[in-house]
């Protein structure tokens, strides 16, 4: 038996940015505004989850922050799980949709990349 020490960097995420992203999306799933969810006790608003389109775990590969409005997507719980654990072809459709809606906003935040690069980074395939 050997001991294994693992060091992991966890990047700070802003709860304020997440809440403001939810408000900007009017507490609707940005991939399908028709998706319904339950009302959260803590906010008395539809329960949504914040998804970093480009994962915070990749922050060390970028010279600008990934914890910015343009990179935080308001998703219903089902879409959030699907974008992480769904079939690759379905995830690509979701990521293509996010890129189409967000690429200019990402560029204004200093995050410039092609659609193919975006999908590879978002899927951790680089």
Feature annotation, model-predicted:
Residues 1-45, 57-67, 122:
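Short, charged surface segments at domain edges that flank catalytic/cofactor-binding sites
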Residues 42-126:
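A detector for short metal-coordination/catalytic motifs
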